[in-house]
Amino acid sequence: MPFLWGLRQDKEACVGTNNQSYICDTGHCCGQAQCCSHYYELWWFWLVWTIIIILSCCCVCHHRRAKHRLQAQQRQHEINLIAYREAHNYSALPFYFRFLPNYLLPPYEEVVNRPPTPPPPYSAFQLQQQQLLPPQGGPAGGSPPGADQPQGSQGAQSSPLSGPSRSSTRPPSVADPQSLEVPTERAATKALGMESSSSVASHGELDPGAFLDRDSECKEELLKDSSSEHGGAPPDSKDKTPGRHRRFTGDSGIEVCVCNRGHHDDDLKEFNTLIDDALDGPLDFCDSCHVRPPVDEEEGLCLSSEGQAREHGHPHLPRPPACLLLNTINEQDSPNSQRSSSPS
């Protein structure tokens, strides 16, 4: 080529316009009649370098894309291999689990029965009452049979402030049409007790002796009402069946006994046999039902009118006491309830 020859020789013959030749003493032929001393002055020099740079960039991009694609394929292959190994080894137990003895594992029933069974009741008498309640007609609202427990046991388990709110009258069942009369009588008794309590609180403090006697009588009547109501007997049969009396034990339990005061021996024996057959065990009778039970036994205030106080000396005459059950939410902070409530 002519420009290579110019590098070797000091003079270079160049071909110009119209095939006319000229000689460049220094440099190389440039253009049609010029001599250039540097290669960067040539136009094709920059064209070659531009093509080289573009091709190099294309090669670099292709190489990086191929490298990234290969790395992604390798990662996916490793993930598939790990998943395949886990799925293959999942069915078989590990080696250190195959020789694990069976007595170290919990029983199947213990694992399945979650949550565990509830704790036993506070006394055996309450358990017997729960066993006797399901054959009777349940409440109209379709509540579970465990909610239809006797009011006596509910009042014993509750605290002195929350007991009266729980021992309110339950809705009458469909199978017991005669129990409709019991809530009406109790509502009238509550209204009478509220009026008498307000009048007594305005006059002054109560007489301690009369208050203790009326409180014990009120508690016995409440126990009789609860036993007759849950037993399905009409209110007229209260005098024919003996009442119940409760006393606290040292282990915070409650013992329920039958009060045999004011009843004949024949009726008492018949009632004893019926209770023994129903509860599969003998039930103790109270030695003295006239003794006043502890103060925490029943929550509430028993107030009666002056006519009922005059009849206190005649135990055979029917005396329906007026009982006021304190509301623990509305009357808890009032000063009247603090003066008239029984000490706990």
Curated annotation (Swiss-Prot):
Extent of Low complexity compositional bias: 145-173
Phylogenetic lineage: Eukaryota, Metazoa, Chordata, Craniata, Vertebrata
Its membrane topology: Single-pass membrane protein
The name this protein goes by in its record: WW domain binding protein 1-like
Coiled-coil region list: none
Entry keywords, A to Z: Membrane, Phosphoprotein, Transmembrane, Transmembrane helix
Residue spans of biased composition, Basic and acidic residues class: 212-228
Main localization category: membrane
InterPro entries with a match to the protein in the record: WBP1-like (IPR021684), WW_domain-binding (IPR051994)
Region feature (Disordered): 132-250, 302-321
Source organism: Rattus norvegicus
PANTHER family from the UniProt entry: VESICULAR, OVEREXPRESSED IN CANCER, PROSURVIVAL PROTEIN 1 (PTHR16209), WW DOMAIN BINDING PROTEIN 1-LIKE (PTHR16209:SF4)
Modified residues (Phosphoserine): 173
GO cellular component labels: membrane
Locations listed in the record: Membrane
Pfam families in the record: WBP-1
Molecular function terms from GO: ubiquitin protein ligase binding
The keyword Protein biosynthesis belongs to this UniProt entry's keyword annotation: no
Segments passing through the bilayer: 42-62
A single BP term in Gene Ontology: CXCL12-activated CXCR4 signaling pathway
